[in-house]
């Protein structure tokens, strides 16, 4: 829903503002102590509403960066991953949901600066990871602009 890393899902705090669903998420980069929160948009607002994402109950929550415990979360995430595999297509991994969000940002023509902020990584990482999707997205966007310009002539 929000493109969070599996280590970040316990910190997701969904909220609604101006009719849009967002979340505040603790950014947890690999091998780093988390200190920063970011704001992320639910790209599929209809899904967020259908899943009642504003009312999700979690078995564990992180409300402050100081509450982050890597060992405890690894244990919880392992349990969650096993449950997820049993309930879904075994080939689908929780991290695939993060990548789907990343590709969706390209398909929705969200610029790489904004998309990388939503996902909590650098613009360079975002651009290189989702380059193919952005290449196609950029081509489609350019074609649409050309078509609009030709129609206005």
Q: Which positions does each model-derived feature cover?
A:
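Catalytic-site neighborhood detector that most strongly recognizes the C-terminal catalytic loop/helix
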Residues: 27-32, 119-144
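Intrinsically disordered, low-complexity basic tails/linkers immediately adjacent to helix-turn-helix/homeobox/MYB/SANT
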Residues: 144-153
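Short, polar N-cap/turn motifs at the start of nucleic acid-interacting alpha helices
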Residues: 15-21, 110-129
